[in-house]
Swiss-Prot record:
GO molecular function annotation: GTP binding; GTPase activity
Subunit structure: Homodimer. Polymerizes to form a dynamic ring structure in a strictly GTP-dependent manner. Interacts directly with several other division proteins.
CC per GO annotation: cell division site; cytoplasm
Family of this protein: Belongs to the FtsZ family.
Record-linked InterPro entries: Cell_div_FtsZ, Cell_div_FtsZ_CS, FtsZ/CetZ, FtsZ_C, Tub_FtsZ_C, Tubulin/FtsZ-like_C, Tubulin/FtsZ_2-layer-sand-dom, Tubulin/FtsZ_GTPase_sf
Any one biological process term the GO annotation gives: division septum assembly
The entry's keywords: Cell cycle, Cell division, Cytoplasm, GTP-binding, Nucleotide-binding, Septation
Keyword Nucleotide-binding: yes
Disulfide bridge map: none
Subcellular location: Cytoplasm
Protein name per its UniProtKB record: Cell division protein FtsZ
Annotated PANTHER family: CELL DIVISION PROTEIN FTSZ-RELATED, MITOCHONDRIAL DIVISION PROTEIN FSZA
Primary role: Essential cell division protein that forms a contractile ring structure (Z ring) at the future cell division site. The regulation of the ring assembly controls the timing and the location of cell division. One of the functions of the FtsZ ring is to recruit other cell division proteins to the septum to produce a new cell wall between the dividing cells. Binds GTP and shows GTPase activity.
Gene: ftsZ
Amino acid sequence: MAPPHNYLAVIKVVGIGGGGVNAVNRMIEQGLKGVEFIAINTDAQALLMSDADVKLDVGRDSTRGLGAGADPEVGRXAAEDAKDDIEELLRGADMVFVTAGEGGGTGTGGAPVVASIARKLGALTVGVVTRPFSFEGKRRSNQAENGIQALRESCDTLIVIPNDRLLQMGDAAVSLMDAFRSADEVLLNGVXGITDLITTPGLINVDFADVKGVMSGAGTALMGIGSARGDGRALKAAEIAINSPLLEASMEGAQGVLLSVAGGSDLGLFEINEAASLVQDAAHPEANIIFGTVIDDSLGDEVRVTVIAAGFDSAGPSRKPVVSPSAAQTQPIASARAGKVTTSLFEPTDAVSVPAHTNGATVSVGGDGDGGIADDVVDVPPLMRR
């Protein structure tokens, strides 16, 4: 009799373009486990700096390894020319994340090609991308909108993280490096928030089939992560997650929700119920809510809540207007070294300091600035730490 096999979901994360490759590097630095990393770029020099498991240099004949020049058509053609290589790299994956910074050339044009290949191979395909800062120019913003639409049609689920929201979370002294690093942090959290649900065993477990049930063919999705300590910590963490200023829209009306609550061994049934009830109230009355808990004593008295909301109607999630940085009352981005962005943006909040729950988050949309930044390196995607 053959010994039992240990079947695990095969998850691959593909970073394409300058922003996508930077995002992958950040995930590797933060120790994201249980996934295989693939970096794809037309910029051969930038690709050399990647720490990914696999690197693919595309468009060598058309770009000579010098990048796409912020032209999505060049990026699309480069990815299509390498279709066979990309297909070989993605074969066997159960789930594929495609991450990129929208608005440039390689990521904007190539991400839909990668997503289409992954979906054709039968993998659950999730896009996690950033919308550019307004100061990056109107041309880049328009290219990003077109790229986001193309990617939405090519993958099962798409999470869009608007960089302009980071300005509302920062102070006037925030550096350019800090701003882009914090964007990478958000991308990291988008990928880690989903993979952790699958790869981390829980007391109430969420497996790959649960995730696939919510995200397969779901279209636009929203992701929020919150953490808190002290009295009412689980409820406050849930409030932070569903009202995150980094969400592009309100989760109201979501038909499918993935909810994970992580905490120490003292995590109580009553506080779990409070957090789950709050999320349930924010979603559609008939929503399919997949719930899981993880006991992790290394969290101490911190409770961490991850919410992925998907399955909106044809109109999609309701967008909200951008709030000016001066009007936003949120936690500041560290203005010193970029490494401090993680702690300032995603540090657990003392429960007593969290504002009362409100309906939905405000969204940030790409901007209308006049200037143009044509360098692919600028589309640095956001990542998050656990």
